[in-house]
């Protein structure tokens, strides 16, 4: 939208391909990568410049970027995987969901990926346990099925009705052979060097917790083992240390670690620096990121037009 209005637009991306989660996070069977690639090519043809392998804050300071551009939009998303402090969590064969999906997508893009070839991020022939109940967990279980896993189990501490992910995705996964272990949570991970089982316990739902959902609590004496050669942790995502990453102490951060913006202008506490998407609202859906992006483009246009008007008035 900004390019259509005549602005020069540059996109800085830390990865070697543009597209973010559309390219590396969402499985190919849900969003074919040639669709994303075609859209990127259309943007390039329209004059949008892509600066790849550029990690803002590490490779290029945000302060320097602010001097180079009249306005900046931060739309980095939330990528920090939530960890689980459980005995055995450091065993080989326990991997973050996004790392697993990224490897799978790179393979689909025709890359030769060591982590896939050596089996560490490949579900073929393995008993796979995915821990989590969101859409990312569903992407992982369905990817594992397509990699010809021996078995795929989704371990979730609440029941089907209280699952945050799409129930349609759950239905698709069940049709493909995924087993859902509802009201169950991991207690520990067993194995010597590599994981061999997930020590789990049955849960029950009690009164509502602070989020308004029924809180899960352990059922004493209900522990059981799930065989596992590959455990995929899909517990959700949090923002990275944004002040540390960007080197801007004046950048206002919410108590959840997301960026604080003026909801009317979509501007952060730094003049001319806007933010949109998951980095503001927390981990959410692509459709919301698209809406936020469109709203941010209009907000940036309004800001730039106002600045141009001031400059014209001063010149008269």
Whereabouts are the PLM-identified features?
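FAD-site-proximal beta/loop scaffold in flavoenzymes
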Residues: 90-125, 209-283
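Short, well-ordered alpha-helix to beta-strand connector turns
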Residues: 47, 69, 91, 125-126, ...
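Feature captures the FAD/FMN-dependent oxidoreductase FAD-binding
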Residues: 37-86, 188-199, 206, 228-232, ...
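A conserved FAD-binding loop/helix module that cradles the flavin
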Residues: 140, 276-311
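Rossmann-like NAD(P)H-binding beta-loop-alpha module
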Residues: 1-5, 110-149
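Generic beta-strand/beta-sheet core signal
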Residues: 12-14, 53, 74-76, 97, ...
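Beta1-alpha1 glycine-rich phosphate/pyrophosphate-binding loop at the start
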Residues: 1-56, 82-87, 99, 137-183, ...
